[in-house]
A protein has these predicted regions:
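Active-site catalytic microenvironments in core metabolic enzymes, especially phosphate/sugar-handling
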Residues: 1-162
Length: 162
C-alpha cells in the first residue's frame, strides 16, 4: 500500500526516492537528500521515500542483506527527519513502525499527545513545546492511495483549531 501511496503523492509533490545501494556507498547521502529538500520545501509538502518495488527490494536486500537494508533505510529516514526539522519542517507523515520509532528518536521526542484513530487508522500525534511538531504515524497496509494528502490536511486542520 505504501508504494502506491508514494506514487500517488509524487504526482503532485516533489519526492526523493532513496537508493539504498547508493546510500550505502556515499557518506554524504543524507546531506544530498537535505540539499534537495532545502531546494523544494518552499513549494509545499515534499516526500522522502525508501519504498521500492519487489524486484528492486530483492536487489537491494541481496547486496545489503534484509536487516542491513531495513536498518539503513530507518537510519537515513531518521537523519533526514532531524535535518528537515532543522530546516523548519514541523509536520511529518511517517510510514512503518520501526521507521516511526527511528524518526521519534532522531527528533528527541519524549512525549506526544495522541489523538484517536479514525477511518485512516493513522496515529495523529502532537509534540507541544517551544517547537511544536505534528506527526501522522502510518501503520502497515492502509489501502487509501490518498492517505498522505488526507494526513497532511488533517494536520493543517488541527493547526487551525489550535
Amino acid at each position: 500500500a505504501t508504494l502506491s501511496q508514494v506514487a500517488y503523492f509524487e504526482q503532485r509533490h516533489p519526492t526523493f526516492r532513496v537508493d539504498l545501494i547508493e546510500a550505502s556507498e556515499r557518506s554524504d547521502y543524507v546531506d544530498h537528500i537535505l540539499s534537495w529538500a532545502a531546494d523544494n520545501i518552499s513549494s509545499g509538502p515534499i516526500g522522502v521515500s525508501t519504498s521500492v518495488d519487489v524486484k528492486s527490494l530483492k536487489i537491494t536486500q541481496g547486496k545489503l542483506g534484509r536487516q542491513g537494508a531495513a536498518d539503513l533505510a530507518d537510519r537515513i529516514l531518521g537523519e533526514v527527519a532531524s535535518g528537515l526539522h532543522l530546516l523548519g519542517v514541523r509536520k511529518f507523515v511517517v510510514a512503518g513502525g520501526e521507521t516511526s520509532g527511528q524518526v521519534m528518536n532522531a527528533l528527541g521526542v519524549k512525549q506526544l499527545a495522541v489523538a484517536g484513530f479514525d477511518e485512516l487508522s493513522g496515529g495523529y500525534c502532537h509534540q507541544a513545546g517551544t517547537e511544536p511538531t505534528s506527526f501522522v504515524l502510518k501503520a502497515g497496509a492502509i489501502p487509501k492511495d490518498d492517505f498522505f494528502f488526507i494526513a497532511i490536511e488533517r494536520m493543517r486542520e488541527a493547526d487551525m483549531r489550535g
